Amino acid sequence: MPQVGTYKRHQKEEVIALMGGLPFKADIWDWQFESNPFGYDFDPVVLEEAGQIVGFNAGMDIQVYFNGEIVPALWSCDFFVHKNYRGKGIGQVVKNEQIKKSDMIMSFGISNMAAPVLLKKGWVANKDVALFKRYKKIDSAKKCLLVILQVLNKLLGFLHSSGKSDSEIITTHELSNKQEIDRLWNKVKSSYKKIVVRNYDYLHWKYEKHPLAKYLFLEVRHNNELKAVGVVREHNGQVKLIDLLAHADDSASRLCIIKQLEINFPSSHLFICTTTDHLLQKSFLSLGYFKAWDKPRFFVRAEHDNQEGAMDWFLMTGDSDGELLSASSDSYSIIADNGVE
């Protein structure tokens, strides 16, 4: 019978093999798990039998601004059961152990197989996640219809998006300094009910220290004061708005950042963003994006406020470990294509 174990650093290669041998996982492991921006230790769930890892569930410890307080939380990620032990209840045991790790556990980008397991264990689904797209290239009948929808959305949103902004937007490869980013975060955090702490340490770790991926930053300034920061990534003609730091009511900065995407990437054929932010969603529609039918799942298990704990979150693409993996995979493929060892 498998027993709960304690993760040891020398087991890294065994865990990566359990994951199916992701070619880039070794390159990002220490950054993702051993260099936490909030100073937390890596403490995954490990199930072992006869010296072999048969179940594993990692977690990325973070802090969240939750109804006016800064509290610890855990992003669940990298949940794997050895192929010879599937269908034997090992996954249930792993999740039972993970529940002991944190009073608030969040999961984003959940598979069809994992979703019912989490719901049975007390996770609650968020209803606000939406995926927005804008096609610039028509190569099928379906895309032709979607482009028509984009035009209609833009016409309907013309009054919302046509106002002039007196702000300046700057594209840069580096975040602004720690003092400016932290000042902006402290200014805007209370405008949200629930949001992952987006201070300088977190943003710097996630988007500047990533071992493989490269991100661009869009700074919105008014009279040289930093008002908002957008995080962007492009790969093979697809542009993603990954993250946003701005006041919850700042419509002008949202519109400014979305417009800048097409200015910076005029030849790209697809623009994408996943978000729960209703003002950002409205801004996308007004600028000719459409709301896709498919969307990732976001579940929360909050020990003291479970039914309400999944509601009213500000969430972006970058909150998901799926983006972390996607960025790694895209960057790894570029390295491989260029013949770089």
List PLM regions with ranges.
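Short, high-confidence coil segments that cap the C-terminus of an alpha-helix
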Residues: 42, 102-104, 213-215, 266-270
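Glycine-rich phosphate-binding "P-loop"
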Residues: 73, 77-83, 244-248
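Active-site/acyl-donor-binding loops of N-acyltransferases
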Residues: 105-160, 222, 233-251, 258-341
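Conserved beta-strand in the GNAT
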Residues: 46, 52-63, 75, 80, ...
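Non-catalytic interaction/regulatory modules that flank or connect domains
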Residues: 178-232
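Catalytic micro-motifs at enzyme active sites that drive phosphoryl/nucleotidyl and oxygen chemistry
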Residues: 34, 61-67, 92-95
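Conserved acetyl-CoA-binding loop-helix of GNAT-fold acetyltransferases
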Residues: 81, 86-100, 250-263
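Short amphipathic alpha-helix that is part of the acyltransferase structural core
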Residues: 1-53, 70-75, 129, 150-201, ...
